[in-house]
Amino acid sequence: METRKVKETKDGADVKRFRERLKDKKKIVVKIGSSSLQHSETGDLDYTKLDVLVRELCDMRNRGKDVVLVTSGAIAVGKKAVNIKDIKHEEEDNPIAVKQACAAVGQARLMMTYQKIFAEYNQVAAQILMTKNTIVDNLNRYNAHNTFSELFKLGVIPIVNENDTVATYEIEIGDNDTLSAIVAALVDADLLILLSDIDGLYTDDPRQNKNAQFIEVVEELTDELMDMGKASTGSSVGTGGMNTKLIAAKIATSSNIDMIIANSKDIKVLHRILDGKNIGTLFVGNKETYFDLPEFVANMHNN
Ligand SMILES: Nc1ncnc2c1ncn2[C@@H]1O[C@H](COP(=O)(O)OP(=O)(O)O)[C@@H](O)[C@H]1O
Ligand SMILES: N[C@@H](CCC(=O)OP(=O)(O)O)C(=O)O
């Protein structure tokens, strides 16, 4: 049984009020990682999970919300399709090209699967592939923003991933936790939900430290909290571990967007979160900060 650690609110008020306001969120970005989409034993797609994910997203649309899905999985699905088990950097002449080739195969397959399931719920979905330049270049950013706005007006759910085949993978945005927060800031979302292979943020990696305590709410991302993720690596399938989730939290909360990390083992948590239930770790958006998105993305890997 996990020990829950509830951070006191600044004014001592009940943390429940932060959960209550989740009921009113209108524009929601949901991110799912590769490890959550696959069966861990075989690496094949978990269709049951994908089905529940799509159903939850369509139901959010039916509740009148604007919804974006940021999905990983292109490389993992591509690797499976061309029968590559491991991309070992020391054994490949050009490991990045191998990953990019896998992404080219896998992205199309992944979208095919999503399109099929979204169609079952009579929901139109779109694909948006982004690179660092989509945000840094003013005209690109303006066009991307307008495209999202039009898709929302049309009731379409945009499905986003990094354009791994043209991005220099690992030195551009590189992970979808960060990408999802960037997307949330770009579209002026009011909630970002990261579905992970863990319940939320702990005081330390609970897989390494049995005494790690669960943190229910983070009202202020202190340096101490940011350091909590730095040593982490995450699963063998996932890219960023907790570090990239905390970077995402920094981007989101500085843009006044609430963010939640929740466990993807039961994707039905999505509607429960929107019902104000106490699930996952909630990072509270900060109204007082100004966040310069293009500036941040331009300097991302220099920080
Ligand atoms: N402080 C922490 N709190 C929670 N999980 C942590 C922490 N530090 C490291 N981790 C690890 O990060 C993992 C989640 O990252 P990752 O595997 O990249 O997830 P995903 O593929 O879902 O994005 C957890 O399974 C956990 O082992
Ligand atoms: N863009 C890559 C995923 C990168 C990524 O961040 O993966 P993950 O840590 O599983 O969310 C892909 O689609 O394979």
List each model region and its residues.
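C-terminal catalytic "cap/lid" subdomain
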Residues: 2-124, 128-303
